[in-house]
């Protein structure tokens, strides 16, 4: 699992337009509870998040998803032309509406300013979630999220940039891709099932 993760996360080294959210200690930095232990025994044990940047001739936009480390499912996501706290609020609202009871879950991220923010920390605390952060500047501590971004960009972004003539057209494509990824794209890790089907099967046993 770790080897596959590290190979897939080559994107964190070669990404042409990586978004850097680290702005120093602007809030509270959480301990690295995860410590590269990506193992799980069931869904809803460990989530991870990050923000990835997409550049076009008409501007930039930012994708902020939450990924379940057991199923690889995208739990919630928000695409915005501004990487701001409102984007994170919408992402969290989507996740907690879908899964309101996540007591004891570990939620991992990098040390981006959004995740140090009092709103983010309090939202996790209110849902009895344990916050974990990567070491500063170490993308391998969050390589599962980096792997997803790399796969997504290879499959629907690199070489296709000119197909997206506006934010609206790209947003529609992102919605379509994540729906496909969650509900149709099979993976070896999920016993050759799409992530959502794997979660549903796991939670029924």
What are these regions (language model features)?
Residues 73-77, 131-134, 158-160:
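Short small-residue beta-strand/loop micro-motif enriched in glycine and branched aliphatics
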Residues 14-51:
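Charge-mixed, compositionally biased segments that are often intrinsically disordered regulatory tracts
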């Amino acid at each position: 699992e770790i080897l596959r993760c590290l190979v897939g996360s080559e994107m964190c080294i070669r990404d042409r337009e990586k978004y850097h959210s680290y702005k120093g200690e602007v809030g509270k930095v959480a301990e690295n509870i995860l410590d590269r232990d990506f193992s799980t025994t069931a869904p809803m044990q460990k989530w991870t998040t990050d923000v990835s940047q997409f550049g076009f001739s008409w501007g930039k936009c930012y994708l902020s998803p939450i990924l379940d480390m057991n199923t690889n499912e995208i739990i919630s996501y928000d695409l915005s032309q501004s990487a701001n706290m409102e984007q994170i609020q919408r992402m969290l609202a989507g996740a907690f509406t879908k899964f309101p009871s996540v007591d004891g879950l570990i939620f991992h991220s990098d040390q981006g300013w959004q995740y140090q923010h009092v709103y983010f920390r309090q939202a996790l605390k209110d849902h009895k979630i344990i916050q974990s952060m990567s070491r500063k500047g170490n993308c391998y501590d969050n390589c599962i999220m980096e792997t997803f971004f790399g796969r997504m960009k290879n499959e629907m972004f690199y070489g296709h940039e000119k197909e997206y003539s506006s934010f609206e057209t790209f947003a529609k494509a992102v919605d379509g891709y994540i729906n496909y990824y969650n509900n149709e794209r099979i993976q070896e890790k999920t016993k050759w099932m799409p992530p959502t089907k794997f979660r549903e099967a796991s939670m029924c046993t």
